Amino acid sequence: MKTPWKVLLGLLGVAALVTIITVPIVLLSKDEAAADSRRTYSLADYLKSTFRVKSYSLWWVSDFEYLYKQENNILLLNAEHGNSSIFLENSTFESFGYHSVSPDRLFVLLEYNYVKQWRHSYTASYNIYDVNKRQLITEEKIPNNTQWITWSPEGHKLAYVWKNDIYVKVEPHLPSHRITSTGEENVIYNGITDWVYEEEVFGAYSALWWSPNNTFLAYAQFNDTGVPLIEYSFYSDESLQYPKTVWIPYPKAGAVNPTVKFFIVNIDSLSSSSSAAPIQIPAPASVARGDHYLCDVVWATEERISLQWLRRIQNYSVMAICDYDKINLTWNCPSEQQHVEMSTTGWVGRFRPAEPHFTSDGSSFYKIISDKDGYKHICHFPKDKKDCTFITKGAWEVISIEALTSDYLYYISNQYKEMPGGRNLYKIQLTDHTNVKCLSCDLNPERCQYYAVSFSKEAKYYQLGCWGPGLPLYTLHRSTDHKELRVLEDNSALDRMLQDVQMPSKKLDFIVLNETRFWYQMILPPHFDKSKKYPLLLDVYAGPCSQKADASFRLNWATYLASTENIIVASFDGRGSGYQGDKIMHAINRRLGTLEVEDQIEAARQFVKMGFVDSKRVAIWGWSYGGYVTSMVLGSGSGVFKCGIAVAPVSRWEYYDSVYTERYMGLPIPEDNLDHYRNSTVMSRAEHFKQVEYLLIHGTADDNVHFQQSAQISKALVDAGVDFQAMWYTDEDHGIASSTAHQHIYSHMSHFLQQCFSLH
């Protein structure tokens, strides 16, 4: 299931911050507001992306150089001085798309025939371009419909997956070496993930890991034998007389899971023989005795690797550190190098155990884990010791470790001003943990409170990406003194364009319930007047570890609703939400569909009490988990909401995948948590939908939250005699993102809200 923390888009113009309220670009008096002749941000503006936010995507290729695509040329830039040269001219890409350059910059992968599969996976064809010869390599080409391909960390070796088997090219012009031969569609996956590992565990299609100096290639093998298949029709072109049927091995809650094996192959041995024997590293006994997952792989050094394994009930994980035995040509994972991580209140990590960050010699590492108070902080694991020492602490959370040098560790946290929805870059001295400095907090505090960072290879330079609350800003910095070297992109052109638009403002604040702060955001109409009454739309996700109230910038559907329709669009992070400690996040452990649903209802009540919300025009909408919560809220009989929209909702947790669902709910068996599985369905609340207006939307080719989920809601509502609206999107997946479907769904939802709120 898509988690909102992974996705950052954008919301208003360059903003000034008044305490915790962002305000529009241009401040007008009431008289001036009444005479404001500027146009509003329209639905067409959103659907056609009239106003585009610019980013600056760079690829570090050394500790002081990076590549950047400009006007279809690939430029090589010097970080210190800013001078650039053309690395690849745009004529190289006339028939192909740029994919990646080898670490030694001698070869470039060019991609074509791209075909999307699931969220991350796709197939494509590739050509290899010789930079020095300025021509394509025509001998020993990579096969069409390759599933994954990646350069080695040094030089120009290639590993790729074709027809579920792994191949390696030692030189681009030489024949490929076949590493595996067991691959079988929908059964055995070598070096790539099956559906559930792609979506819920690795968040990627790749299951290949090169060692730092290319000597070894590690890979996972997934076996889906016995995993039940989900099947659905794909209607395709209208000339197709019989629809196609799509089959996917998809383990639902309580069903047979894929099994996993882990191997390492010595690539250097390929030079002396046509094949190399992979060596299997088994899971530790404490997890291997039952169903389990491989959830993280990190090379510490050329001959040391870290593997994290997780029990199917995801409150127990083991990190095994394995070393290469040069004499016996084997890998050893001694028990004294195993580190157990457990949770007694919920699950391990936010979505899985955090990855370790090793020192350069691989002897010790740093990792984000929960401290004794339940906040995610950085702990240092010294050499040959199982216990760790926390180097950060407080009632806030470290989001990610971004870089580790011999002297400092760099991390992103939400410590600044005790605002969970903020993100800033910090550095901490490894020899003195009291020496902590925020590198971004004071750079541009009105415009920038939500940062991301990208470090060069050895962290000598870094790019800061400010993602809000004002317009995104990208700058380049030097680590030695943190001087800003140059502005890479400031979105000044967009700023000028938005001066002529009546933009909404954004309020980020909290309410206190049961002595606990819960944060919310509101997108307020232009010239907001708290003495007036506005319709309210609650935009909800509310899944475990989600966050909707943050300081990032967005131009989206809510921008249109607030600017043109004068609707307040609010989001609330209640119990179950993330980045505020395990007490809040684990509150919904083993009881999805309860507290997070109640909290959205209570939030709406609190918003009405603020005085500027029309209590008779309150709506709710959400997508995916948000569609589930929307439906559960509307089916609660609370009397708070007039209408709502659920897009691609879960309706019964036994219908959803095992990895995600069981993380929070356990198993749907009588000995575990079957009762709550059965008591948390949307269908059981069908009778209460007579009190509300309901729009149900789903794509027929949703591989993630299957159409079955909405079909069962529809059936229950019909059986209960409920009048409701429904819309399906033929052959659309979970994102309903094709150009025509995207425009249609947002137009349709807009019309539904206009009718519900009596706007036109």
From Swiss-Prot:
EC number: 3.4.14.5
Keywords: Aminopeptidase, Cell adhesion, Cell junction, Cell membrane, Cell projection, Disulfide bond, Glycoprotein, Hydrolase, Membrane, Protease, Receptor, Secreted, Serine protease, Signal-anchor, Transmembrane, Transmembrane helix
Extracellular side: 29-760
Ranges that cross the membrane: 7-28
Main location: membrane
Modified how: The soluble form (Dipeptidyl peptidase 4 soluble form also named SDPP) derives from the membrane form (Dipeptidyl peptidase 4 membrane form also named MDPP) by proteolytic processing. N- and O-Glycosylated.
Entry function: Cell surface glycoprotein receptor involved in the costimulatory signal essential for T-cell receptor (TCR)-mediated T-cell activation. Acts as a positive regulator of T-cell coactivation, by binding at least ADA, CAV1, IGF2R, and PTPRC. Its binding to CAV1 and CARD11 induces T-cell proliferation and NF-kappa-B activation in a T-cell receptor/CD3-dependent manner. Its interaction with ADA also regulates lymphocyte-epithelial cell adhesion.
PANTHER family (UniProt xref): DIPEPTIDYL PEPTIDASE 4, PROTEASE FAMILY S9B,C DIPEPTIDYL-PEPTIDASE IV-RELATED
Record's protein name: Dipeptidyl peptidase 4
Species this protein is from: Mus musculus
Classification of source organism: Eukaryota, Metazoa, Chordata, Craniata, Vertebrata
